[in-house]
Amino acid sequence: MHPDLLPVIVGVGQINDRPENPLDGRDPVTLMADALRAAEADAGTALLADADWIGVVQQIAFPEIADASAPVAAALGAAHAELVQSKGPNGDSPILLLNEAANKIGAGEIKIALVTGAEALRTAGARKAAASGGQKGDALRDATHRVKVGYAQSHGLVVPTDVYPLYENALRASLGQTLAEGQAESGEIWSRFSEVA
């Protein structure tokens, strides 16, 4: 690869949207655009409007936004960018988009790529509750890509928090740990992640 084509991350941005009243929260498109603006500020140079490629992680909080890539591009003034949305809001979606962007840069197909994603589950739940007289929905469990009838779903395994404990218990059992030992080890690992975060 020619050194001029080496993909480099020049800016990163993150938005935590927790207004006192959840109804005042931002939607996923606004969160994505704001995160990219924060990344542009981190980069210290104007890049967004010149983006050649925008990769967006599919969001589920607002099902009426089927594909957030075009509204994000419009919010940034990136009229000529190739738009891509991940195939599902999976845990590996951001890294798959980052890999795709890096490969396109390395191949000389594009120069500026933007990767973004956002969820507004708290806001979506509050708005649904306000519209339905107090019944708060569960956007994760109600998402159309999860409401499929299959083996896992028939046993109540719908969202990551249903499945991850199975992995942890299988690992614990294979290591010959008691429940208390397994929980202590998980606690140590996650506390270190929290320190870094």
Positions of predicted regions on the chain:
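Conserved "HGTGT" condensation-loop signature of ketosynthase/thiolase-family condensing enzymes
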Residues: 1-88, 102-107, 114-197
